[in-house]
Amino acid sequence: MNKKKILLDFRKKLDEINYLVLYKEICGSVNFMFNPFQTEAAVVSAINDLPMELSSLMKFFVLGKAIERDIIVEFMGLQLVDNLVMLGLIEKDNGLLQLRNYVIVAYKDFYLVVNKPPFFFGGTSRSEDVYIGPDSYMLANFLPHRHFDKCLELCSGSGVISILNAQNSNSCDAVELNSHACEVSSWNCIINFADDKVHLHHGDLYNPIQSECYDLIVANPPFIPFPTDLTFYPMCGAGGELGLDIINNIIYGLDQHLKDNGMFLMIGEGVKNGDNIPMAALIEEALNVGYEIDLYIHSVENLRTHVVKMANFCRATWDNETPKNIEELLLNMHNRHDMTEYFQFTLIAKKIYKNKRTHFSKIKLQRERSIEGLYKSNLDKCEIRKLPNYYALYQGDDLIASVDEDVIDLLQKKDLDIIEYACKICDERNYDDKERSEFLEKIEKTSKDLIKANLLKKIDEI
C-alpha cells in the first residue's frame, strides 16, 4: 500500500469540489480563521442549502456522517475508497461509508484530518483523539514569518503548526506523545506536501530529539488546570492542578535545546491571584539568565466563572464520568493553591543575552472580558468597537470590557429581569451572602449606567 499516493489522490478529490471554498462558506468567514468548528446546527443548515450530491459529500467530510456507499464511490472511485478503508481513514457500515470518527478541517490552503469534536453528533472525546481548536489557530497566527534553519514543535497534535513552519524552514521536528496523533499527523503532512521537511517523533517532549538544538521552538501543550485524581479529562488538555505539569518540563528544557539567538513561542491558559502568577514564577526561576521574555496575559476572568464553564463542558462531554460535585472539586483545587483568576497567555522568549540577567516583562493586554468589567467604566466616554466575536468597550487605548450576545440579551431584559438574571449567576457560582450582595450591587449599577448611556442604541448603530 502506497500511503503517499493514496493521500495525494484523496487531496485531488477534495480539490475537485473546491473544498477550501465550501468549508469557508459553510463555517462562516469569521469562524473559518478563528475556530476550526462552527456549531453543528449552523453547519447542517448551510450544507442543506447545497445541491443534493454536494450536500451529501459535505456531510461526509465536514460532519463525519455516514453516507450511502454509492455516492462516495461515484465521487472518489472504488479503488481510492478501498485504499482509504485499508489506511483507516474510512470505515464501512451496512452499505454506508463514513470517516472513522474523523472530519476534514480546511485552514488557509491546508486540509487537516482530525477527530470529530465531541459536540458533533456521534463525536467523542478520548485521550487518543487528535485535537485541533481555537488555540491551535491562535498559535498559527503568532508564528514568525521569517526563515529558520531548524524548527521544533512540542505536543504537535494534528501537525498543523509544523506544516506551517515547513514553509519557512529547512527542516522541522514534531514530537507527540499520542501515537494515534502521530499517525494522523503523518497523513496531514503528506496531504499538505510537507512530509519531506517535517520529521515526526513519537515520544515525550525532548526525549526523542536528544541533544538537538533549534532556531525556533513552539509549543501548545496540555495546560488546563485539573484535579490529578480525576482521570477522565484527556491528556491533550489536562495540565495538573496549576496547569504547569507539562509546561514546567518544556521551560526547563529550553536552555539545552534553543540555539543562541533562537526564539521560543508558546500559548496556554493559567491561574493567578493578582500579581501571584505561578506561570511567571516558573519562568523567572528556570530562565533567569540569557533571555528576553514577554509574557502576554489576556482574557482574565473570575475563577468562579471559569469553574462553571469547565463544569458545564465536562458534563456535556463526559456526562457519565463527571462527578456530580465537579464545581466543588474544581473550586477546592483552586482554593488549595489560593488562586482567584483564570487567564490566557502568549509567551515569547528570545535567547539573545550571554551571561546577562534575563529581561522579563509581564504584559496585561486587557482587563476583563465580561459584564463584570463594565461597572468600572465611565460609559459616557467609552468607544464601542465591533470585533469578530464581541463588542469591545475602550477608554482611549484601554480595553475596559467586552460585550457578547449574552450580555446584549441581559441588557435588553431591563431592570427587574436583570437582577433575576444576576441572581441566577450568583447561584451558579455558589456566591456567599457578601459576594452575592456585592455582585448584585455592581450589576444593578451597571444596568442603570448602560441604559443611561444608551449602550444598546450605540451598538445597533455600529
Where are the regions a protein language model picked out?
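Acidic, low-complexity/disordered tracts enriched in E/D and polar residues
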Residues: 1-55, 95, 100, 119-121, ...
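S-adenosylmethionine-dependent methyltransferases
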Residues: 2-42, 47, 71, 83, ...
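Long, charge-rich, low-complexity alpha-helical segments
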Residues: 53-101, 140, 399-462
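SAM-dependent Rossmann-like transferase core, predominantly class I methyltransferases
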Residues: 93-166
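S-adenosylmethionine
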Residues: 124-135, 145, 177-325
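Conserved acidic residues
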Residues: 149, 170, 215
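Conserved SAM-binding motif I beta-strand of class I
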Residues: 171-176
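Flexible, glycine-/basic-rich loop-and-beta segments that form/coincide
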Residues: 305-375
